[in-house]
Amino acid sequence: MPLTRGRFAEYSGQTVLSRVGKADAVNLEPSVDAWRLTHRCSEYHLIYGDNLQAIVIATVGSPSIHVLLESITQYARDLPVYISSNSLELWAEVRGRLKNNRVVFRPNTATNFGDAYNSIVSYAFQHGDYDSLIIANDDVVLSPDTIEKMKADYKYVGREFKVGFLGARSDYVLPAQNIRVAEQDDVFSALKWESELHIKMTDVIAPIFAAISKEAWETAQFPSTNWYSDNIICHDLCKAGYFHFVSRGYVHHAGSQTVGNDFKKCHEEPREWIKQHRPDMYEVFYGNT
């Protein structure tokens, strides 16, 4: 049972942007189904300004966060970082690594993914002057051009669409974002699939490293669950007229360092919450049981 229908289905999975050389971005007239981004990301960023103005992380102490912080130190040092955690040692490490005063620490008193991120993301939007920011899992690692590509992609699709999530590609994530999953008639060249050079529209984004605007965040937030929180927020945003996209930007994902790899347990945990609070979505995940 698809989570989105009608207006969304006709675009879902299509390539809407590709990078094929150099040109003047100002003169581009994108169409809905096949856009061509024929300029370098750095040039595009200078033309269309700034976005994705902070990184927000919630953690329960996964060792992977130390690797994430090192990659932020190397590739996103200038972005403010908001962290929800109960570790004072981690707070000291973050300030020491990034060596700036734009690190905000908040206690993490939540018992699930949804509530943890709702709290820290809402705090960042309320106390920071941000139009958009990046939600990050604590077990991902940035590449040198992750932020650059996502900034360019987010600004570009935002010219034509109400953007819900723009999610990074990864190696341990939903199929639409997964670099291990080739598109139909894909070509493997220069150590990657040709489709990785494209933005595409999709039904659901796993926001392991994903951009969202303040406007979209005020429209829908995560349910109080671990699993299926992504599906539900994406569904709610689609119903409100937003579209979700897969970026060309990439992050490595260690995978399930927080909720674990017992998939049957993860599937069953949110059953009663969804049945009680989101009965409209219950059948999507659990059928008639």
Question: What residue spans do the PLM features occupy?
Answer:
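Short beta-strand-to-loop element that shapes/binds the nucleotide-sugar donor at the catalytic cleft/hinge
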Residues: G164-V181
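Glycine-rich, basic loop-to-helix element that forms the pyrophosphate-binding segment
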Residues: N108-A124
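Short beta-strand-to-loop acidic/aromatic patch adjacent to the donor-nucleotide binding site
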Residues: Y130-V141
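C-terminal catalytic/acceptor-binding lobe
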Residues: L3-T38, P223-T289
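A recurrent flexible, glycine/aromatic-enriched loop bordering the glycosyltransferase active site
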Residues: L191-I212
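Short, well-formed alpha-helical segments that are part of the catalytic scaffolds
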Residues: G61-Y75
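Acidic donor-binding segment of Leloir-type glycosyltransferases
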Residues: T73-R106
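Conserved donor-nucleotide/metal-binding helix-loop-beta segment in metal-dependent transferases, i.e.
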Residues: D145-F165
